[in-house]
UniProtKB/Swiss-Prot annotation:
This is Small ribosomal subunit protein bS16. It comes from Zymomonas mobilis subsp. mobilis (strain ATCC 31821 / ZM4 / CP4). GO terms for molecular function: structural constituent of ribosome. Transmembrane segments: none annotated. NCBIfam families: S16. Residues 111-143 have a biased composition (Low complexity). SUPFAM superfamilies: Ribosomal protein S16. GO terms for cellular component: cytoplasm; small ribosomal subunit. It comes from the Bacteria. Belongs to the bacterial ribosomal protein bS16 family. InterPro entries: Ribosomal_bS16, Ribosomal_bS16_CS, Ribosomal_bS16_dom_sf. One of its GO terms (biological process) is translation. Residues 96-110 have a biased composition (Basic and acidic residues). Keywords: Ribonucleoprotein, Ribosomal protein.
Length: 143
């Protein structure tokens, strides 16, 4: 029989309350369990001492006989210093997707076009200013 340390939901609709239980992994989430070793109330603030309550002696016993904690319970046990969670490595998580890359390229192209247009607009008045000065110089030579 595979035994797991997991959460069993209780409480009213939209007001969850969880018991941390030892249960057969094949039994339903809120079904029968072997032993209750704690509770978790997500409604309480994160710094509240009653948010997560775990009987560490019983948890240590069940871990020693091979019970497997779920991810959330493993997080609680790690915070209590009873279990060392493995660090997960997902280097591709932060890599942008194809559409995001396309949008970034389009933005870069628009920025380059805008910079080029601004540069051309800045050069055009400068060229026009030089032209009247040349005309004035040629007009003064004629006079």
């Amino acid at each position: 029989m595979a035994v797991s340390i997991r959460l069993s939901r209780g409480g009213a609709k939209r007001r969850p309350f969880y018991r941390i239980v030892i249960a057969n992994s094949r039994s339903p989430r809120d079904g029968s369990f072997i032993e209750k070793i704690g509770s978790y109330n997500p409604q309480l603030p994160k710094d509240n001492e009653n948010r997560v309550i775990v009987d560490l002696d019983r948890a240590r016993h069940w871990l020693s006989v091979g019970a497997q904690p779920t991810d959330r319970v493993a997080r609680f046990l790690d915070a209590a210093g009873l279990l060392e969670r493995k660090a997960r490595n997902n280097p591709n998580k932060a890599v942008p997707g194809e559409k995001a890359k396309e949008r970034a390229e389009e933005r870069a192209q628009k920025a380059a076009d805008a910079a080029e247009a601004a540069k051309a607009a800045a050069e055009a008045p400068a060229a026009e200013e030089q032209a009247p000065a040349e005309e004035a110089a040629s007009n003064s030579e004629e006079a």
